[in-house]
């Protein structure tokens, strides 16, 4: 039933209630039938479930498969399970890191679950009683006054200047006047226009009234939003999609290489026996170990965690680890207006009148908002609070004014006459101040205050006032007028009709919820980074458009549409107009989700920011949802991927930069690790084809997990490139091998493999003095040292994709430290007896050590030369 279309009496009858409320027996019966007035929360997964969820990552599944195969072969061959244990340790550490980071984010948010008032005042059997809000039932009559939180959806049945602030639900920052009158408008009436309804999540900021509860718990508007969140599927991030693609490629690559090696090995043996098959299979497994970058999953997780830490320092709290880099490829940011682009605080920005101080005095005294001079804070209805703050900025003291001119009578504001009047004692006389809508107040004025005195109002004065009013409303300001009247003594008749006539006009004050000062620069930075901001708000279209123009969001050719207009569009029409619409006003929650989904369907990576409950479904539907930590509701914070701890839209720009840096660094690490594994695969493949063993599986695990992981992690700390915020966002469909990364992995893998094979043969020659193809202890040790150190030196090449290493101005000290640590560990592994025995190494001479290091160092000049050729080729293509 649309209660707002029916009278108060009809609503009470439909709900089987009375103006005196329910009896206690009726309330108990309905509570037992309908349940408590609480929002259902989806059960949170246990730590165990979250741990196993980490194991569902495709890269982890590949590692687990490798561990299983390795375990079977080790058991069959009665060999050590060291490989299996090491791989499983990597998997466990990676999963623990993921769970820890997500848990840490949850603690950082520390969301409050109190979404409604703890207690509410209701009428039970005609008496006002206080009850826990969770025990409210349909039909209860609420007793409300300024400062109360609305504990359930309700239909107003009595109103005395009642106003409610509904920004969290509708997005509109200006409080809405509430009355008991039924609405008669045709067509759909949006939440923000239902002037006789109150909703859970809103609050009373002025006046008092009574309302009958129409819905509780999950049946409220907030409950519908919470329910919609549980129906919305989480989207995979671009990084998750790319890593899944990489896992599939690696899986097929491993299977293909193993099949080839197994087939060639059996054919070379010339006979098929259990021993031949087992030996060949073990070689194939060693290749699988070489091909799989065991440390990649852990490196990605740790690099993301580093990014999370960096973002938290910039006031951005990440709740979902893989969402860290998603902002780096965001193309659309759909942002709420109130509290996100604006300050969510009405502020006087313009005035018109002969005496600004007198105008501010009138506005401040004809208001119920209170200024605390000790804390310099103002409490009260937002519009009146803005007027009081304005008086303070002009050097006036509202508390001193009230002491000097105490209020002795008043005609409170009501929505019918759109005015409020107060009478004050002034040294034996009475002065009246009246404020209200200009179109209502101006006709009641027959004088105007000019140059310190009241003069008769003329048509020219009225025209000038009307022009000022048009100018302010044209800038989407909310305009109030003020007037005064003096008496020798307090009049006997203080009714509004008697007081509000023969007034002296003082002036106009225009106010608006102003933009955050830093947002203008933030939006400009977004545009330079190729990101398009879209405003989505529940506020009026004129106000939204004015703010959008001020911010540069609404330019020539851009459109602003209302939720009603959007609702009237079919999907085809909306798709055609989507690219031209920059502002959406008076929208409902389902409209926001539709907008986000339309951009996603068009192939754009979309972010959604917001603080109100009305933003939560669209935040959940977006590729990355951004909530506000201070003004944001708990529902919104709980579904967001990222929470801005300072509620600052400008923080998003820093998060975008960090996201891009993280992706660049992950790609550096992936390129480094895959190139390294490519060199290992090619080395073992070539050695197998030639009939000798160059490295054992345990050697490869050492390289993959110790030698390679430290530099890969250090690459994850690389600083952002200078052009990172001037290049367009990358495509969500862009392969991780794009921009020549795949080619680099192949040629650099071949390069390191050739150097490794060369080290083996040189080592064999230095040991035996002959060039032959056979197993060699010194050759294996030199090959291990060369491969390890070649990858260490090669990690420095990864700092720049195409630029020369020697053009980088800032050193990566983490990488220098990682290289030194890897060199030390590798050297210890060769020369410390128990380690050398464990890895079956032979200590090599100083000359052999120097030769191996020299071969490894060659990766630097070789890659620098190739980069030079690539840069020249790129310049030729650019000129063509």
Regions found by a protein language model. Give the residues of each.
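Conserved cytosolic headpiece of P-type ATPases
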Residues: 1-729, 734-737, 750, 765, ...
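Membrane-interface starts of transmembrane alpha-helices
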Residues: 82, 775-782
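Transmembrane alpha-helix/helix-exit interface in multi-pass inner-membrane proteins
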Residues: 261, 753-761
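Core segments of transmembrane alpha-helices
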Residues: 679-680, 744-756
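Generic alpha-helical transmembrane segments
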Residues: 707, 780-795
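Long hydrophobic segments that form regular secondary structure
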Residues: 761, 766-767, 775
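A C-terminal functional module that forms or caps the active site or interfaces directly
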Residues: 798
């Amino acid at each position: 039933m649309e209660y707002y279309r029916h009278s108060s009496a009809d609503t009470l009858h439909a709900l089987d209630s009375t103006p005196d409320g329910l009896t206690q027996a009726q309330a108990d019966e309905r509570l037992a039938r309908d349940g408590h007035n609480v929002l259902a929360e989806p059960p949170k997964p246990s730590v165990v479930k979250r741990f196993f969820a980490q194991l569902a990552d495709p890269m982890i599944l590949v590692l687990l498969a490798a561990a299983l195969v390795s375990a079977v072969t080790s058991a069959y061959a009665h060999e050590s399970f060291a490989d299996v244990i090491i791989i499983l340790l990597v998997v466990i550490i990676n999963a623990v890191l993921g769970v820890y980071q997500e848990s840490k984010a949850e603690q950082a948010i520390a969301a409050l679950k109190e979404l409604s008032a703890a207690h509410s005042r209701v009428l039970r059997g005609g008496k006002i009683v206080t009850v826990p809000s969770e025990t409210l039932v349909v039909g209860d009559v609420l007793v409300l006054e300024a400062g109360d939180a609305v504990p359930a959806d309700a239909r107003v049945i009595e109103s005395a200047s009642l106003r409610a602030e509904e920004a969290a639900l509708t997005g509109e920052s200006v409080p809405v006047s509430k009355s008991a009158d039924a609405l008669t408008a045709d067509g759909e009436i949006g939440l923000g226009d239902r002037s006789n309804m109150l909703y859970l999540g809103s609050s009373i900021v002025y006046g008092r009234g009574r309302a009958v509860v129409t819905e509780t718990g999950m049946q409220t508007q907030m409950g519908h939003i919470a329910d919609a969140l549980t129906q919305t599927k989480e989207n995979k991030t671009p990084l998750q999609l790319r890593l899944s693609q990489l896992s599939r490629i690696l899986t097929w690559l491993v299977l293909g290489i193993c099949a080839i090696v197994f087939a060639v090995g059996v054919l070379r043996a010339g006979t098929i026996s259990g021993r031949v098959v087992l030996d060949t299979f073990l070689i194939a497994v060693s290749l699988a170990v070489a091909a799989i970058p065991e440390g990649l999953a852990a490196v990605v997780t740790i690099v993301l965690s580093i990014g999370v830490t960096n973002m938290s320092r910039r006031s951005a709290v990440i709740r979902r680890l893989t969402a860290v880099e998603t902002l780096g490829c965001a193309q659309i940011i759909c942002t709420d207006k109130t509290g996100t682009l604006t300050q969510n605080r009405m502020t006087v920005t313009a005035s018109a009148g002969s005496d600004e101080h007198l105008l501010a005095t009138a506005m401040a005294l004809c208001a119920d908002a209170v200024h605390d001079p000790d804390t310099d804070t103002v409490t009260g209805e937002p519009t009146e609070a803005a007027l009081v703050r304005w008086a303070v900025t002009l050097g006036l003291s509202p508390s001193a004014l009230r002491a000097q001119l105490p209020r002795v009578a008043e005609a409170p504001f009501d929505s019918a006459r759109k005015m409020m009047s107060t009478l004050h004692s002034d040294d034996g006389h009475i002065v009246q101040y009246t404020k209200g809508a200009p179109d209502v107040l101006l006709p009641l004025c027959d004088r105007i205050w000019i140059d310190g005195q009241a003069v008769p109002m003329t048509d020219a004065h009225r025209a000038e006032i009307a022009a000022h009013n048009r100018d302010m409303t044209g800038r989407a300001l909310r305009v109030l007028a003020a007037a005064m009247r003096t008496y020798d003594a307090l009049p006997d008749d203080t009714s509004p009709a008697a007081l509000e006539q023969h007034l002296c006009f003082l002036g106009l004050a225009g106010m608006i919820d102003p933009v955050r000062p830093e947002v203008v620069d933030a939006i400009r930075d977004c545009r330079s980074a190729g990101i398009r901001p879209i405003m989505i708000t529940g506020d009026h279209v004129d106000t939204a458009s004015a703010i959008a123009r001020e911010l540069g969001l609404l330019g020539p050719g851009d459109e602003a549409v209302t939720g009603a207009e959007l609702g009237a569009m079919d999907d085809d029409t909306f798709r055609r107009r989507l690219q031209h619409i920059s502002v959406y006003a008076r929208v409902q929650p389902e409209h926001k989700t539709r907008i986000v989904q339309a951009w996603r369907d068009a192939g754009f990576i979309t972010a959604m920011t917001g603080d109100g409950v009305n933003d939560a479904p669209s935040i959940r539907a977006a590729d990355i949802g951004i909530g506000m930590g201070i003004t944001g509701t708990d529902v919104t914070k709980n579904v967001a991927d990222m929470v801005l701890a300072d509620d600052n839209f400008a923080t998003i720009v820093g998060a975008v930069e960090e996201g891009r840096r993280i992706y660049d660094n992950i790609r550096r690490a992936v390129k480094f690790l895959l190139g390294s594994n490519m060199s290992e695969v090619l080395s073992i493949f070539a050695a197998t084809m030639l009939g000798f063993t160059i490295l054992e599986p345990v050697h490869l695990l050492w390289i993959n997990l110790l030698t390679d992981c430290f530099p890969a992690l250090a690459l994850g700390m690389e600083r952002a490139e200078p052009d990172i915020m001037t290049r367009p966002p990358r495509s969500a469909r862009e392969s991780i091998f794009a921009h020549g990364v795949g080619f680099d992995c192949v040629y650099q893998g071949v390069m390191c493999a050739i150097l490794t094979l060369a080290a083996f043969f040189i080592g064999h020659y230095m040991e035996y003095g002959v060039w032959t193809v056979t197993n060699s202890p010194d050759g294996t040790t030199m090959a291990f040292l060369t491969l390890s150190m070649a990858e260490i030196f090669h990690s420095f090449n990864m700092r720049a994709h195409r630029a020369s290493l020697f053009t980088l101005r800032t050193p990566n000290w983490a990488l220098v430290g990682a290289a030194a640590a890897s060199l030390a560990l590798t050297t210890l592994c060769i020369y410390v007896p128990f380690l050398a025995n464990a890895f079956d190494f032979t200590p090599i001479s100083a000359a052999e050590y120097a030769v191996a290091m020299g071969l490894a160092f060659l990766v630097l000049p070789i890659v620098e030369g190739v980069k030079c050729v690539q840069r020249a080729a790129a310049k030729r293509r650019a000129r063509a």
